């Protein structure tokens, strides 16, 4: 048998990446609006970038020294920076280099055609000891619009996130839907959200059906 490279060493490195992340399974059974949770952790002295203006209605509630938006597309009232995160450019030569204390990207990364380059770019925009808050799907339906104004490329497992964010430290995952909630959301979509999720019934049901399977993830990371 011929061995090329050092596959055994790489296998161990990958295992260590996964073992070193934190998965807070208890979060699954605590129905919370994670946008509100993020809002509580933003200090008025921070600089902040919201990719895709993904804080939605909470964006206007953010109080900090400076808050900016970034998007590949142009909408009526944003972004401040039009930027293709998948484009490998020299961030170091732009005003975005190490500019932000906090970067938020919620339900954005699945729409980025090269998430590896995107995360590298976001890391360069982040100050030392800054934090990234994100939300990514694992089991979720295809949701690009018919006109493909934005596209839908990827889904992310725990192992995939560990590798994607391998240059960060203090990687923490918080599941927001379990086995039952994810299945029902795929099958019934907005009906499920307007009923069970609106009245916070899904954490109770997930408690019975989802303890061994964590599906959708919210992810918070610190550089």
Task: Please describe what each predicted stretch is.
Residues 113-123, 131-223:
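S-adenosyl-L-methionine-dependent methyltransferase catalytic module, highlighting the catalytic core
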């Amino acid at each position: 048998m011929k061995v090329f490279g050092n596959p055994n060493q790489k296998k161990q490195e990958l295992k260590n990446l996964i073992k070193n992340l934190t998965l807070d399974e208890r979060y699954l059974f605590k129905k919370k609006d994670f946008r509100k949770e993020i809002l509580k952790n933003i200090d008025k002295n921070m600089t902040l970038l919201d990719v895709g203006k993904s804080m939605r209605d909470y964006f206007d509630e953010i109080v900090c020294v400076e808050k900016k938006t970034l998007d590949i597309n142009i909408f009526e009232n944003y972004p401040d920076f039009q930027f293709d995160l998948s484009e490998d450019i020299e961030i170091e030569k732009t005003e975005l280099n190490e500019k932000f204390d906090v970067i938020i990207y919620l339900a954005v990364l699945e729409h980025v055609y090269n998430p590896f380059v995107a995360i590298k770019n976001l890391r360069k925009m982040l100050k030392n000891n800054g934090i990234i808050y994100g939300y990514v799907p694992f089991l979720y339906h295809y949701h690009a619009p018919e006109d493909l104004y934005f596209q839908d490329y990827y889904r992310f497992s725990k192992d995939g996130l560990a590798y994607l964010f391998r240059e960060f430290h203090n990687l923490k995952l918080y599941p927001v839907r379990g086995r039952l909630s994810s299945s029902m959301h795929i099958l019934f979509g907005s009906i499920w959200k307007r009923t069970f999720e609106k009245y916070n019934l899904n954490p109770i049901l997930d408690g019975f059906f989802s303890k061994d399977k964590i599906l959708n993830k919210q992810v918070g990371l610190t550089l």
